[in-house]
Amino acid sequence: MKKYVLGLLIIALTYACNTKQETAQQIIDKAIAKAGGERYKNAEISFDFRKGTYKSERRGGDFKLERIMPDSTGTQYRDVVDNNGFTRFYKDTVVKLSDSMETVYANSVNSVHYFVQLPFGLNDDAVNKKLIGKDTINNKEYYEIKITFDVEGGGEDHEDVYMYWVNTQNYHVDYLAYSFEVNEGGLRFRKAYNPRTIEGIRFVDYENYKTDDLSTPLSELDDLYEARQLELLSKIENKNIEVKLLE
């Protein structure tokens, strides 16, 4: 009898260990590893997005994010965000800007690079992760992970809230949603498509959807997407992607 009870306990403990729920941190770690992992930290990545040409360079803790794009007058500028802040160049000359405009341009440059290199960046110090649960989209199971940001280190958009749907089998981020406060606020839902891997780093494009009902919880946007109740706002396509791994 004792052996029988002991056997049941061992089976129960083994089952409990095998079915132990992963934490949000563990899921994000796996998602980053699947998408490129350590390669992000020492790489040059360039791509074209809409009218701009973008380039990022990371070497350990040092980084530089660039954008070359004409303004409304056709004048071409090079915007740079690095460890020291933001700088705008016209040819090789530094262009003086007000602090408020520097913030606007810096956020714009950073935002494009951020989305292109997702899920890298989700382990930054100011990022808070919470596992909401699991859900199913198009018959595939996903972890739902909510992302918020600390005021300190979270940037000008620290009030934004994100939801990521991470595939429970391959740990790819196939969907994401976010709420934002600028320009009277809004909600967006994105579906990843056209995945490709270049030098071991995974990239995707996005279908970008919206809803005008700003009271909708982020966690319900996937249901609205499946019910075709979201409006396709745009497609976010990154072209001519090149990656150079640095030593």
Regions found by a protein language model. Name each.
Residues 20-26, 88-158, 183, 247:
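Flexible, processing/modification-adjacent segments and terminal tails
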Residues 142-241:
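Gly/Pro-enriched, hydrophobic low-complexity segments
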